[in-house]
Amino acid sequence: MALEEVVRYLGPHNEIPLTLTRDSETGHFLLKHFLPILQQYHDTGNINETNPDSFPTDEERNKLLAHYGIAVNTDDRGELWIELEKCLQLLNMLNLFGLFQDAFEFEEPETDQDEEDPSHSKLPENKTKSENSKDNISSKRINNLQDMSLDSDAHRELGSPLKKLKIDTSVIDAESDSTPNTARGKPNDDINKGPSGDNENNGTDDNDRTAGPIITFTHDLTSDFLSSPLKIMKALPSPVVNDNEQKMKLEAFLQRLLFPEIQEMPTSLNNDSSNRNSEGGSSNQQQQHVSFDSLLQEVNDAFPNTQLNLNIPVDEHGNTPLHWLTSIANLELVKHLVKHGSNRLYGDNMGESCLVKAVKSVNNYDSGTFEALLDYLYPCLILEDSMNRTILHHIIITSGMTGCSAAAKYYLDILMGWIVKKQNRPIQSGTNEKESKPNDKNGERKDSILENLDLKWIIANMLNAQDSNGDTCLNIAARLGNISIVDALLDYGADPFIANKSGLRPVDFGAGTSKLQNTNGGDENSKMVSKGDYDGQKNGKAKKIRSQLLKNPPETTSLINDVQNLLNSISKDYENETVQYNEKLEKLHKELNEQREELANSREQLANVKQLKDEYSLMQEQLTNLKAGIEEEEESFREESKKLGIIADESSGIDWDSSEYDADEPFKVEFLSDFLEDKLQKNYEGDISKLLEAESKEQIMEQIRNQLPAEKIQSMLPPTVLLKARINAYKRNDKHLTNVLDTISTKQSELENKFRRVLSLCLKIDENKVDNMLDGLLQAISSEDPQDIDTDEMQDFLKKHAS
């Protein structure tokens, strides 16, 4: 950043330094050095006694900026900078232009001879008279902010992009073109008036500057709104449009309208614009108006079979284009939309009208467009949302938002001032064309809303209106603690004794107690109603409340006692509820423990069932295996029977019951076995070898035949097939046993050879000598205790026998 600094000295002895610092890149001048001189000039009108080190506070600085219409830019370090034009205006106002003219090569500014107020802006020579007039009007609008006693802290916190207090001059031109002679006055024109509406400046009527007609549009006003008596009504529900063609057409129109720099404008439109610029006789507003109509025609050409519906919601909250444009303070487009049929009575999903959107943001406060906005959106004043909240409710709620206190006070004062001033303004009937024409000989239109919407109706129907919670606007303001708005509402006649559904009243929060005690009944500053329509001193209800409070001021002792009783009651209720909840908690804990026990039992039963299921599955598997084994054994038995010569037909009648037939029983015939057993015991002492040596088989068989008849022997013998099976089985078993014996003998021989080999290796002798030495070795080992064996003697023994 390249800075240029020039120091000059003021005062009769040149003892007051004044430094001008300019940023050569942007051309802006540092504001800090102007502030001490401006403060001294504002307080005394003389700068010769300025203390250059005495800087005003933030609040005083903001008042100076508002009073002199200074727009500032803030850099990254927080320093405030002003533009070249404003620097020249301030230097000329302070008669310091000549000191710095040569240093910065300033051009001599042209002074407006008709301007008497030093706070009004003065422009350089290169400004035209038209531009000078516009800036003067803008400066007046900005200067009015200081007169309203705005909250400077809240004003500094406003988050609007218009915070620099720059006024769009095209809006002012649009006002003068569409509504002749409607130059807007100060936002607080009515604040400076007495209760009867008279101006305090020696009877001068400030309404002369705002005497332009109010142009009415009735395309959206039904008979309910135009009929008498006037009453508060619900906003129309947000429309539901399912036609995608209409949505696409509206979207295309809004894109071309709001973002013209990214749209390709038709050649004809550009040519028309160039022709108008070349003529030099049309204003910025006229160019915008033609652009609006041209864009409208362009969209109609693009969608010839689809009607342009300006009331389609553009977001999920049900906001129409009119809602959005009022919230961003685009007055020019609001006027065009109303002229072309946009419905002002539609609410969003919460029933909030477009005027509510205007007061819920600070944009209309920053740009000073709220008063002009009321000329087009006045039907919204009698609307309430889904929670029965009027426009006054929403203004008060806005005052509780961070940085919006000053804006809310501005909206309230402008609204009440517009209500009073509109009674003296003519009314014209507007159409959806470019011009509006009066509908009677006096150029006025009899509109029931404008006829009946006076301050008396506002006080009677809206000031003390309650929302769905029973809150009046005064109740909300008292709870928020906004003293300036509370005092204003009380001056208008708001009732501080109306309780909401919770039983709370504004007076419970101190609303009106201190103010009314210090207010005289004849104080002219407390009167807020015009003389022609309503006298605030004759308001019976407000007068009764005021006199009641003055005669019987509230006792703080009783209030403290009531609060103490309320706290005690709340504490007792809390203790009772705590006991109840503790009992419920204990009961729940008990039930929880029971449920836990039941759950544990259920889990145990489930584990047992799972175990039984596993055992059952195991037994099922074992049973299946047994059945399979039995089947295999039966198959094997059948194969073995075939090998033994047992035919299935022959063995079908045999009883194979294990109780009568033992598969392991020796192959014997019972009577033969008994005969041989008896013979062995009697004759051979049980030695069968002696029997076989003494007698042959034929002799034994002959003896049996002699003892028993052949029929009995035949009956006692098993079936032939069984005998054959036994014989074959015996032979097979004998063969099997012989094979087993041979196998064992072979294994034994191999084992003996291994042991013989081991001994030969241990004794270091030949294998063929091991057998001869085994007896002596065994005797030597077994005759001694293993612990007492003399290994040397054993070695001698082995050597002796080895030789």
UniProtKB/Swiss-Prot annotation:
Please list the residue ranges that the record marks as compositionally biased, kind Polar residues: 139-149, 514-523
ANK repeat residue numbers = 318-346, 347-383, 384-469, 470-498, 499-514
Q: Which SMART domains match?
A: ANK (SM00248)
Disordered, as annotated region:
108-150, 169-212, 266-288, 512-540
Residue numbers carrying Phosphothreonine = T179, T182
**Which GO molecular function annotations are given, in alphabetical order?**
DNA binding; DNA-binding transcription activator activity, RNA polymerase II-specific; transcription coactivator activity
The compartments listed are: Nucleus; Cytoplasm
Matches recorded under PROSITE patterns:
ANK_REP_REGION, ANK_REPEAT
Q: Which InterPro entries match?
A: Ankyrin_rpt, Ankyrin_rpt-contain_sf, SWI6-like, Swi6_N
The GO cellular component terms are:
cytoplasm; MBF transcription complex; nucleus; SBF transcription complex
**Signal peptide (residue range):** none
Q: Name the Pfam families on file.
A: Ank (PF00023), Swi6_N (PF18530)
Chain segments annotated as coiled-coil in the UniProt record: none
Main localization (coarse): nucleus
PANTHER family assigned: ASPARAGINASE (PTHR43828), CHROMO DOMAIN-CONTAINING PROTEIN (PTHR43828:SF3)
Miscellaneous information on this protein: Present with 3340 molecules/cell in log phase SD medium.
Subunit = Component of the transcription complex MCB-binding factor (MBF) composed of SWI6 and MBP1. Component of the transcription complex SCB-binding factor (SBF) composed of SWI6 and SWI4. Interacts with MSA1 and STB1.
Kindly provide the name given to this protein in its UniProt entry. Answer: Regulatory protein SWI6
Query: Per the UniProt entry, what species is this protein from, by scientific name?
Result: Saccharomyces cerevisiae (strain ATCC 204508 / S288c)
Q: Identify the gene encoding this protein.
A: SWI6
